[in-house]
Amino acid sequence: MRWGLRPRGPGAAALATARSLWGTPRLPCSPGWQGATKRLLVRSVSGASNHQPNSNSGRYRDTVLLPQTSFPMKLLGRQQPDTELEIQQKCGFSELYSWQRERKVKTEFCLHDGPPYANGDPHVGHALNKILKDIANRFHMMNGSKIHFVPGWDCHGLPIEIKVLSELGREAQNLSAMEIRKKARSFAKAAIEKQKSAFIRWGIMADWNNCYYTFDGKYEAKQLRTFYQMYDKGLVYRSYKPVFWSPSSRTALAEAELEYNPEHVSRSIYVKFPLLKPSPKLASLIDGSSPVSILVWTTQPWTIPANEAVCYMPESKYAVVKCSKSGDLYVLAADKVASVASTLETTFETISTLSGVDLENGTCSHPLIPDKASPLLPANHVTMAKGTGLVHTAPAHGMEDYGVASQHNLPMDCLVDEDGVFTDVAGPELQNKAVLEEGTDVVIKMLQTAKNLLKEEKLVHSYPYDWRTKKPVVIRASKQWFINITDIKTAAKELLKKVKFIPGSALNGMVEMMDRRPYWCISRQRVWGVPIPVFHHKTKDEYLINSQTTEHIVKLVEQHGSDIWWTLPPEQLLPKEVLSEVGGPDALEYVPGQDILDIWFDSGTSWSYVLPGPDQRADLYLEGKDQLGGWFQSSLLTSVAARKRAPYKTVIVHGFTLGEKGEKMSKSLGNVIHPDVVVNGGQDQSKEPPYGADVLRWWVADSNVFTEVAIGPSVLNAARDDISKLRNTLRFLLGNVADFNPETDSIPVNDMYVIDQYMLHLLQDLANKITELYKQYDFGKVVRLLRTFYTRELSNFYFSIIKDRLYCEKENDPKRRSCQTALVEILDVIVRSFAPILPHLAEEVFQHIPYIKEPKSVFRTGWISTSSIWKKPGLEEAVESACAMRDSFLGSIPGKNAAEYKVITVIEPGLLFEIIEMLQSEETSSTSQLNELMMASESTLLAQEPREMTADVIELKGKFLINLEGGDIREESSYKVIVMPTTKEKCPRCWKYTAESSDTLCPRCAEVVSGK
């Protein structure tokens, strides 16, 4: 117990006595028995007397001690969200973070908040993420750590800029860079306030007064220092390379800024590249009587004008075939002969085969420019999965193509401009035509005219789209700033071996994504972001960046923000005193660069600004699976590049939210769940009731977050029902300790009833398991373990058998105080166990605990504390063997009141008999612990069967395996349960069948009443 009222349990002597050598634990009333009977035996408490004496009738109503608490069983309608708001105010939710930061504790737990994007209303994905983080933080705080959790927002970038421009419409065309930036900042701030309010309403504990924002000048300055660190190490460079390019956004994009449309339709074509000069081997296989062409397939016809080569796989087999339709000879992969012939609706006769290496030194002519030669070149990226096994290569429009061109010094001319339109270099027929639309049409017609088009067909496949404009992208070479991640990747993968990933499979996913990444383009051609601190010469292809110029810019940004790049004149951005340090070039010869940094670099350097201490390493990063290629990766790469260490120790990856049937949420399907509606209810509250924040939190904790997470009305109703059952359990606990003071009324553990000691034993096991599950971040198992405990072990089992003791014994009777002592400990452990998940409910319960005089906050009183003296595995044998017999008894009287029967238990002499004697020392009793478990009129314990029995008895046989000293001693004992109707009458006070007549009290009640 951690209410701060008393030390727990007896001293060292009692502790030594408690160290019994008993068997392996089993759950209560588990079927650890084997038996045979003429009736069906059911594991249930059906048939048990589970009454609550009626205090509203009869002359004894004032003598019954019924539960007393103001804790409500249910909160209806607006009561739930309104109560939560009252609790947040009363219990100091807003002060909790600063309070715990001021504690003097040795350990610190740092969870680094991946910044959500500041461009919209809060959604259930936010709820899933923030609540998971809060559960982890609240547990670690209660468990003794100081929490470092600074929320942040990703404020720059294309999505915000596009949203602002789209809202402005035609007006946007006339805006200056600074006007766009001003409106983008205002938009981001508004989104941040909406999201922040929602996060606070959900009960998220954080440093809300000191959040980080990527548009803050101090943050931007840190980012620029990291950029220059990497530049100074030679890891950042400017180059002309193909990158993903969004014509709709007019900027380069990173892989993480793409989304793939599986329904994209491309126009795929089979194209002839006439053989110009055969390789020596190929020349020996053809006689020159028929035209020979290299056969190529592509899904991007618009790239054909930029072709510079055709690539083959050196190790593969190729075939020279004759086409039955045209008589022409074609060269293609031997494995593709049949499938390509079928596609072209013809037949191929194989003339000869050769190895890929035998194509070396061959050339073919460009299919649109006959005078231009395209060499045949080896390449490892060629596959046989689709196409012809020969790949058209346009260095300006493909990553692998660029690699081949670099190796063989091929031209890399780009024929496409920033708008995705052919330039004049492509020729008059193509100039000014959009490559993905009319440009493709014209290229195909040109191929037809040149008689080099064999087939065109539509292909539905996955294709990259701009994540914000939802329009297709192209690959286009341009001058950009890149990070050389080849060397960084090697070090990063080595460092990842020391990082714990949950689930473990996420590590492989992240490594695979890094391996597929040839380089990282970090420049963007927009204005809403952090400028790359580079100056370009007005007339020469030169740029200026060094430590002096960068540090000057960094200091300006730190003081005034990155707007200075667009507002200050060149002579202030490049003052003479700075230029004199580097040889004195004239500032007027240079202009500030127009590129800004990729937002993944923006957010990926957050570790440098947010993480505390010299190590600057977070204990935990926790984000959605999309961040394996996003923030997790950009944080790792920048951290490894700048300081050769990973920024995190543990990475948790959760899934995405879906509709409750597993479908994607969309307005058209009408299945979008808004967290504000979940918490506060919708317009029609009969259809969209206010669940409150705790239901949202329970949904998060109860979900298998490592896969996709479903949410919908039935899921939320199930969460509400779970919490309702938990409230009933808590109300029972609170109501039955109303007259109990732990300081004066507690019973020493060794003097408690066996069943009460047994519950403490189970409670300690529960506490240990829950603590370990929280440490493993397995919140779903925490919920399931708790739910099982409060429904099965408490409501269905323990509460049903102790009601008589609680309600009908004398107020200060040790038997009653014994179970109240257990109830206090149960209440303590249960409340602390769910507090990180349901903070509002935990605080509400805390305010209703009668023996806490000035309750403040359960979160300021620590984690679960149990005593080693509670651990009594030996008691399990007594209680569980009795439960096996009880199950047998109750199963024999389905639907009937157990209190109307008496039970004779016959056990052969041995260990089982001695164990059961712990529960009943006398031969027959209506008040023993055994009879309390049986819930019968009376219980008799015998070593041999009675000689005379009436004809209406039920005989049940069974066996119970006793396990002692960890399995060293095992003994199977037989028992018999004899059930017969009682001859006693119903007591008018306790309703047990223990009275001599229906109008007289049973002996126990007579004694209690006479003492009142």
From Swiss-Prot:
Motif 'KMSKS' region mapped to chain: 664-668
Catalytic activity: tRNA(Ile) + L-isoleucine + ATP = L-isoleucyl-tRNA(Ile) + AMP + diphosphate
GO molecular function terms listed in the Swiss-Prot or TrEMBL record: aminoacyl-tRNA deacylase activity; ATP binding; isoleucine-tRNA ligase activity; tRNA binding
Modified residues (N6-succinyllysine): 74, 194, 241, 479, 500, 775, 781
Modified residues (N6-acetyllysine): 74, 189, 233, 241, 725, 775, 781
Residue range of the transit peptide in the UniProt record, numbered on this chain: 1-48
CC terms in the record's Gene Ontology section: mitochondrial matrix; mitochondrion
Main enzyme class: ligase
UniProt family annotation: Belongs to the class-I aminoacyl-tRNA synthetase family.
Annotated protein name in UniProt: Isoleucine--tRNA ligase, mitochondrial
Organism listed in the record: Homo sapiens
